């Protein structure tokens, strides 16, 4: 399927916040409650429509363990968007956001659009981080923000598409040099070209829900 643009995303955050589950829900529309930790980096892709324009999202799901941080850092380069994920039931994952954000700002394109996601909002009875705290963190750091649930799919679609809409707006405003591949954006010329990984809407490798 042809696309106007290809946007590269990276998903970051602590181990166990549900990064791989968010990706699987977005690409395959299913929830897998138990699987292995993500080792290194995994990949998914899907076509979306933003403002009537077909856009392919190429999404890199990273391991949250400290031992993989150096690998994760190498994937910041060349990403147009990032989903920064914490678990609303685990306070420490929220407390670690500043460290993840510092990493992203240090190693990524300065114009990268970042969506902060408070995952597992279906477990509101176990909530350890208020929605207002998430909103405040996002406001202070210039991030988009949503609470979502990989289990129920609430706001999962919206998180990926709102990030794409922000990137598209930045292109239209002249923020990105789309001819530079390090921007994380490829122009599609109306046909699919050079897109690695599995077919649209699928994950080419297994995902790790806890990763």
From Swiss-Prot:
Binding locations of GTP: 13-20, 61-65, 119-122, 149-150
GO annotation, cellular component aspect? chloroplast; plasma membrane
Q: Which InterPro entries match?
A: P-loop_NTPase, Rab_GTPases_membrane_traffic, Small_GTP-bd, Small_GTPase
Molecular function in Gene Ontology: GTP binding; GTPase activity
List where in the cell it is found: Cell membrane
Per UniProt, which keywords does this protein have?
Cell membrane, GTP-binding, Lipoprotein, Membrane, Nucleotide-binding, Prenylation, Protein transport, Transport
**Where is lipid attached as S-geranylgeranyl cysteine?**
209-210
Q: How does it sit in the membrane?
A: Lipid-anchor
Chain positions of motif Effector region: 35-43
Q: What is this protein called?
A: Ras-related protein RABB1b
Q: Identify the species of origin.
A: Arabidopsis thaliana (Mouse-ear cress)
